Design a protein with these regions (language model features):
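Domain-level recognition of nuclease-like catalytic cores that cleave nucleotide substrates
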Residues: 149-177
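Extended alpha-helical interface modules used as scaffolds for assembling large macromolecular complexes
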Residues: 1-145, 173-177
Length: 177
């Protein structure tokens, strides 16, 4: 992930091909019930349910050898969130406030909350260490004011998620802002 770039889909035909050939193929790898549960947990700020679903997905879908770096988890989360493009503009590694957030969901509908996700990864982390990292991630969102972009777009309700990974384990802290 050394070279990041923003890609725009130039027209509806290309967007359709992208949706049908790429996103739907990826989405088929995740049971629909799991994808729906992950989405509902995100929309409601249910950190425990989101943790349970993500951990189950990690246990059943990935190799322990794949999971060493934050960039792996970033790609996994970005892939999961890409299927929400009908409800959200999914943004990754953008500058906002006084820093750069990991993931941002800018709602396309007024009734949906804005969502900011800050990811952390550690090798051989304990449950307590992961919980602390997740709390630190939420604090980072607040201190660096990552929600400025959402607020400027008129988003009134914003959820902050701190997500800490270690191997196939995950801890999540969420907070309404």
């Amino acid at each position: 992930l050394g070279n990041l770039c923003q890609v725009a889909l130039p027209n509806r035909e290309i967007e359709f091909v992208y949706q049908s050939e790429i996103l739907n193929q990826y989405a088929g790898m995740i049971p629909q019930s799991a994808a729906i549960a992950i989405q509902e947990a995100l929309f409601t700020g249910d950190a425990e349910r989101l943790r349970d679903r993500l951990e189950k997905l990690l246990e059943t879908s990935v190799s322990f050898y794949d999971t060493a770096k934050e960039s792996f988890y970033h790609g996994l989360m970005l892939g999961l969130l890409a299927t929400l493009d009908n409800r959200y503009q999914v943004l990754s590694n953008r500058e906002s406030g006084s820093g750069r957030y990991d993931l941002c969901l800018l709602p396309k509908q007024e009734k949906l909350p804005g969502i900011l996700i800050e990811l952390k990864a550690v090798k051989n982390g304990t449950k307590d260490e992961l919980k602390k990292l997740a709390s630190d991630a939420v604090l980072q969102i607040q201190q660096r004011q990552y929600d400025v972009q959402l607020r400027e777009a008129g988003v009134k309700k914003v959820l902050h998620f701190g997500v800490a990974f270690s191997g196939k384990h995950v801890e999540i802290v969420s907070e309404w802002a």
